[in-house]
Structure formats: structure tokens, C-alpha cells
A protein has these predicted regions:
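Glycine-rich phosphate/pyrophosphate-handling loop used in enzymes and phosphotransfer proteins
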Residues: 1-251
Length: 251
């Protein structure tokens, strides 16, 4: 922990990203945990949950929504199963914090968690960091203006740093695209078809495996839309990675 971080923690003691209780800061740690011990334990327990489709723990699960399969995505890596209407407040509050609080500690923590999944996936596919590029799905202009940041960009930036893989912005978000959470599955798919436009980065992603970052994946429409654009730009393959997925139904 650097001097500036230490001084900041002394003046503004860190609070748990989930329950908002003060966290005792350990100056010997290289990285601050954004969760208090109780919430961290709950988070780790959520990671041990089994996927209701394949029966594997979330860190081993590679299930993905049909939209992503149709778009030829290779896999979807996720940390937890997200149930927005469930009782798992530890996850719901944490996701809310990611979306609405621009906290570098939280993004770095998630990136370290994602790193473990990606290393395993890359080894299985014989991929080197030089074979890959990290990108993200841009947030809507309205939400970015409301909160002052884009959580997808922040997650991708932290993940690129811990993985030693370059991050490239591959999409722009159109102003006309609606907020996904208010749409049904069919409407989401139509909305996402016109939500993004490609950036002129073909030379940077051609023949690369693209690691596409998002916070929550529900129907996979956003990921699928991004993947199709990436393939059209010359990408070799697309791996999705997210904090959690709400996908529940069996294929």
C-alpha cells in the first residue's frame, strides 16, 4: 500500500462495499479488501454455489445464454450467480455498489477474482497474453452521466493491468439505445442490435482472442451484439467474463 493510499485510508476509513460498515485497514496488505470479513465470507460462499444447469461450481461453469452461443462466443466466465429478486443481499448490494460507486479498490478486487478464472481458461486454450485483447461494453450515456463513470471501462482497465493484456476500446454506444434492464428478452435483442458501433481498431484486434468484460449478463444480448461486431472486425474468438449471470433456464 502506497503512502497516498495509506493517508487516504486514515482520513477516510474504508467502508464495506456491501454492508457499509467500517473496515479495519491492514497497512501490511498490498491490496485492500473492499468487503468486511462477514461479507467476504458470504461472497466466497456464493462463489461455491453450483450452476443449476451444469451442476458445476460457478468458477468451473462455462454455461452461457443462447444469444451468446448463437454469436459463436467461446465461453462465459462468471464469479457468482446473480438473483436480483432473491434474498442474497450480499451479492445484490455489492453489484449495486459496482454500478453506482466509482471505487478503484472494488474494481481491483473484482479484477483479481476474474484473473483466476481467466488464467485457467487461457491455459486450457493454450493462449498467451500476447494472443489476447481486453475490451468492454460501454455503458449508456444517461447512466454514465448520472454516476459519472463507466463500470465496464473501470473493470476492463483493472483486469488489463492485473493480466498484463492490452485494453482496447472497440465500441461506441449509440445515444438512441434504451436501458436493457427495462426490456424483455426479445426487446433486449432488438435494442442491442443497434446499440453499438465499432471503433476503427481492426489492426489491434485482428486474429486476437477478445476478452469481453461486463458486470452482469442476463439474456446475453449485449455480449452477443458485441461479439458479432468483434468477429466482423477480424477477431479470432470471444471470451465473455462477468461478475455474475442471471441466466437460469436450461438450454
Amino acid at each position: 500500500m502506497g503512502f497516498i493510499d495509506l493517508a487516504t485510508n486514515l482520513i477516510f476509513p474504508p467502508k464495506c462495499a456491501n454492508c457499509k460498515e467500517l473496515i479495519s485497514s491492514d497497512i501490511t496488505k498490498k491490496q485492500i479488501d473492499p468487503l468486511c470479513p462477514t461479507c467476504r465470507m458470504n461472497f466466497e460462499n456464493e462463489k461455491q454455489r453450483e450452476c443449476n444447469r451444469c451442476g458445476l461450481m460457478m468458477k468451473f461453469c462455462r454455461c452461457m445464454p443462447k444469444n451468446m452461443s448463437r454469436a459463436q462466443c467461446s465461453s462465459l466466465l462468471k464469479l457468482v450467480s446473480y438473483r436480483p429478486q432473491g434474498n442474497d443481499m450480499a451479492i445484490r448490494n455489492f453489484i449495486y455498489s459496482v454500478k453506482h460507486s466509482n471505487n478503484k479498490v472494488t474494481f481491483d478486487f473484482i479484477a483479481e477474482q476474474m484473473r483466476e478464472l481467466l488464467i485457467s481458461e487461457m491455459r486450457g486454450a493454450s493462449l498467451l497474453p500476447s494472443d489476447c485483447v481486453i475490451t468492454f461494453l460501454p455503458r449508456s450515456h444517461q447512466n454514465k452521466a448520472n454516476d459519472g463513470f463507466d463500470q465496464g471501462y473501470e473493470l476492463a482497465k483493472s483486469l488489463a493491468r492485473v493480466m498484463g493484456i492490452p485494453m482496447v476500446k472497440c465500441f461506441n454506444r449509440k445515444l438512441i439505445a434504451q436501458e436493457q434492464k427495462n426490456l424483455n428478452q426479445y426487446e433486449r435483442r432488438l435494442n442491442m442490435k443497434s446499440a453499438y458501433t465499432p471503433c476503427e481498431v481492426e489492426d489491434e484486434i485482428k486474429d486476437k482472442t477478445i476478452i469481453l468484460v461486463d458486470d452482469i449478463v442476463t439474456t446475453g444480448a449485449s455480449m452477443a451484439s458485441g461479439a458479432r461486431l468483434l468477429f466482423a472486425m477480424g477477431a479470432f474468438s470471444v471470451i465473455g467474463v462477468c461478475i455474475g449471470t442471471t441466466e437460469k433456464t436450461k438450454s
